[in-house]
Amino acid sequence: MGQVLPVFAHCKEAPSTASSTPDSTEGGNDDSDFRELHTAREFSEDEEEETTSQDWGTPRELTFSYIAFDGVVGSGGRRDSVVRRPRPQGRSVSEPRDPPPQPSLGDSLESIPSLSQSPEPGRRGDPDTVPPAERPLEELRLRLDQLGWAVRSAGSGEDSATSSSTPLENEEPDGLEASEAGETNLELRLAQPLHLQFEGLTPQLSPSSGIPQAHTPSPQRSQDLNTGPDEPLPNGEGEHWRLLEQEPITAQCLNSTDQSEFTLEPLLLVADLLYWKDTRTSGAIFTGLMASLLCLLHFSIVSVAAHLALLGLCATISLRVYRKVLQAVHRGDGTNPFQAYLDMDLTLTREQTERLSQQIASHVVSTATQLRHFFLVEDLVDSLKLALLFYILTFVGAIFNGLTLVILGVVALFTVPLLYRQHQAQIDQYVGLVTSQLSHIKAKIRAKIPGTGTLAPAASVSGSKAKAE
């Protein structure tokens, strides 16, 4: 007893410091904090010092305090066994280990399973044993593995600050299963054909939100692969790039279609009317035109226009009043029967206005140019032909009225195209006979005129060339 008391007295006099006496509240459970410090390390002290100084650059005491602190924080935190570095073979679970540093690019590339040497020939990581035909696919696999490992390393940087540095025994099977599942997923994706992988580049609209969602893009084929420039592409990849090259041509065609759409629509509507595509519409328009023209034969144009406008207003007003009456007797909603036509947007965009103005201006300019060509005698022959035409019209005007000619023209427009479609072969045969007879008569006349006989064969040749063109 005499020897023990001075020892306790000495302990009482010496104050405890934070570095000599660890706090029980900071360390947590003693077994969980220090149970790994009693086992032997696999590496030597020199290697441990080099590794510690190289990775962390701090003394060993900081490493020990980090392990003690990590035991408390990581006990309740989430442990993700997939993003941790793989444990070296030959080290038991109870062995102490240094805290996992942040994985650098070199460590990530060395730890990729696909880059390690495989005992099986033709596997990944052995480019010499890979057949030349499979080298592009092998390089694509390696790049996808590197991208997946970089994502895992970025996720492990966030989880390593809160998770325990030493995995437990019951977590090891889950980590192995997760890593195997990830590898299987990656291999299944790589086993798909290349054209299916490139289809992931196109965005898809989600049915609920309508927001385009893009699949995970696969790396595009670059020039730094092992394939040469003359190596043929696979079928799926070649077709994909061919479609991509054709896209600008398609867009250019669509742009030209949009520009000519404004001018082609009226022509198509007129053609449908003249060819009687819709019998009811063509019949109604033909009847209305003929009735109006026949009325103009007996009445003035002012009275005909006023009567037609009054008839249209009577029809629309009566229909509107009828809907109001149905609303008053609670048998209708009273909406305007012409609301659909009132809601139609008749405004022209800036592009349509510019195109329309350009077309009108071009027609006006061409008409003025032709009139100047004929009446200012730019070409004597053309002016004489126009004079002959007006001379013939003087006799026609003495026999027929202008409205009569218009009526005959309307009848011809609604009958001749339909008849020509139904009897095209016979009409072409008779037209060919007539044109041949006319050309023969012209040749005889030119042969009798002095000075034009040598020009007749050249004119016939040029005419045949023009017909062929």
Swiss-Prot record:
Residues 270-469 form the Reticulon domain. It is found in: Endoplasmic reticulum membrane; Sarcoplasmic reticulum membrane; Cell membrane; Cell membrane, Sarcolemma. Residues 159-168, 203-226 have a biased composition (Polar residues). Residues 32-43, 135-144 have a biased composition (Basic and acidic residues). The keyword Coiled coil does not apply. The modification Phosphoserine is found at residue 44. GO terms for cellular component: cell surface; endoplasmic reticulum; endoplasmic reticulum membrane; intermediate filament; neuron projection; postsynaptic density; sarcoplasmic reticulum membrane; T-tubule. Expressed in brain and spinal cord (at protein level). In the embryonic brain cortex, expressed in neurons but not in astrocytes (at protein level). Residues 14-25 have a biased composition (Low complexity). Pfam families: Reticulon. GO terms for biological process: brain development; endoplasmic reticulum tubular network formation; gene expression; intracellular protein transmembrane transport; negative regulation of amyloid-beta formation; neuron differentiation; protein transport; regulation of D-glucose import. Residues 1-180, 201-238 are annotated as: Disordered. The chain crosses the membrane at residues 293-313, 388-408. PANTHER family: RETICULON-2, RETICULON-LIKE PROTEIN. Inhibits amyloid precursor protein processing, probably by blocking BACE1 activity. Enhances trafficking of the glutamate transporter SLC1A1/EAAC1 from the endoplasmic reticulum to the cell surface. Plays a role in the translocation of SLC2A4/GLUT4 from intracellular membranes to the cell membrane which facilitates the uptake of glucose into the cell. Interacts with SPAST. Interacts with BACE1. Interacts (via first transmembrane domain) with ARL6IP5/GTRAP3-18. Interacts (via N-terminus) with SLC1A1/EAAC1; the interaction promotes cell surface expression of SLC1A1. This is Reticulon-2. It comes from Rattus norvegicus.
